[in-house]
Each structure stands twice: as C-alpha cells, then as structure tokens.
C-alpha cells in the first residue's frame, strides 16, 4: 500500500512540476532577434516595466545612468533650481552618462524606456541616443507617467533622431504583465 501511495504522489508531483515549467515557458517569447532593453529610471517604476519586458522577450537589461546619480532634491520638479528642472528647461542639455559601455552591434531591437518628464523623455535618454550608432536597429519606446501620454515625447524623439527606425511605442502604467504582453506583440 505504501508503494502505491508513493507512486501516486510521485506522479502527482511530476505532473505539477511539468505543468509549471510549461506555464513559465509560455510567457517567454522565442525570437531570433537580439534584444536590448535600455531604460532610464530614478524611482523604480520604469525599471519594473523594463525588467518585465526583458524577462518576456529574453532581452538584456541596460540601465541608462547619469555619471552623477540623481538625489531626491535633483528630482524635485516643483523647484525650478533642481537639476531635473534645469536639464529639462535647457533644450540642449545632455548630461554625461556613467555605467558600462555598450556594443550595439550585438543587438537588433532596442526597447527604450523612460519616465515622462515635462511631457518629454529625460535628457539622459537624449545623451544615450546621441552616444551610440543606431543604424540598422529598431528602437521601440515605452514610458511611464503619472499623468502625461507618451505621444509628445515620441514625436520629439522622431524629430530629433529621424535616422532611427522607430517601432510602436506604448505608455506602460499598468501591471508588469501588461508590459510583457505588449512587448510580445511588438517583436
């Protein structure tokens, strides 16, 4: 009797673990494209969306970081003297970047994530776009925002960088599942 119970329990465990593996595999996209998910995030909101996209499409995460990290005082958009306010009101501001260097030759598709600041992408994103050669790449913007749409920021990006091939953009203020589902649909 113990052997029958043992066999039954073993089969039950095996079938449950097999089903769990299949469910995990179904959430990921198999693509022959090499994907980078580059994002700028100061509070973690955009980072969560970027992480969900990278996990779903099998992309490498890359955090766009300024050479000097932002403090909470730097991000105080109500203070006209704050770093973010000065950067965003100075159209040609291009803050120096830190972090590891990239070889974009390794990638076909770049998801580009950022929060909406002053109805635009933050200036470090502009620095990133001007630092690297995006020839032959497709750049797919996504953003997070407390109240703005992505439309104006993408319009500005297309105007400033007309040689880049831009993919379908999306504002991702929902769940991380929404971010992953959208990413699967645009690859």
Predicted regions and their residues:
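Glycine-rich, N-terminal phosphate-binding loop of Rossmann-like dinucleotide-binding domains
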Residues: 114-115
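N-terminal beta1-alpha1-beta2 submodule of the flavodoxin-like/Rossmannoid cofactor-binding fold
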Residues: 17-109, 119-121, 126, 130, ...
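Short amphipathic alpha-helical segments and helix-helix/interface helices
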Residues: 126-131, 154-158
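Short, glycine-/small-residue-rich phosphate/pyrophosphate-handling segment
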Residues: 140-176
């Amino acid at each position: 009797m113990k052997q029958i119970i043992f066999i039954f329990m073993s089969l039950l465990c095996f079938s449950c673990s097999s089903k769990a593996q299949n469910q995990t595999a179904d959430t990921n996209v198999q693509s022959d494209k090499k994907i980078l998910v580059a994002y700028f995030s100061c509070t973690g909101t955009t980072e969560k969306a970027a992480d969900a996209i990278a996990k779903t499409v099998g992309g490498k995460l890359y955090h766009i970081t300024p050479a000097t990290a932002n403090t909470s005082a730097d991000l105080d958009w109500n203070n006209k003297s704050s770093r973010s306010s000065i950067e965003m009101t100075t159209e040609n501001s291009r803050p120096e970047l830190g972090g590891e260097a990239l070889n974009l030759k390794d990638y076909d598709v770049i998801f580009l994530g950022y929060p909406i600041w002053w109805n635009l992408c933050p200036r470090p994103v502009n620095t990133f776009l001007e630092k690297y050669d995006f020839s032959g790449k497709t750049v797919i913007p996504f953003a997070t925002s407390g109240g703005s749409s992505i439309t104006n920021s993408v319009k500005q990006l297309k105007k400033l960088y007309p040689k880049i091939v831009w993919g379908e953009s999306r504002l991702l203020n929902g769940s991380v599942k929404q971010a992953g589902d959208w990413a699967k649909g645009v690859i």
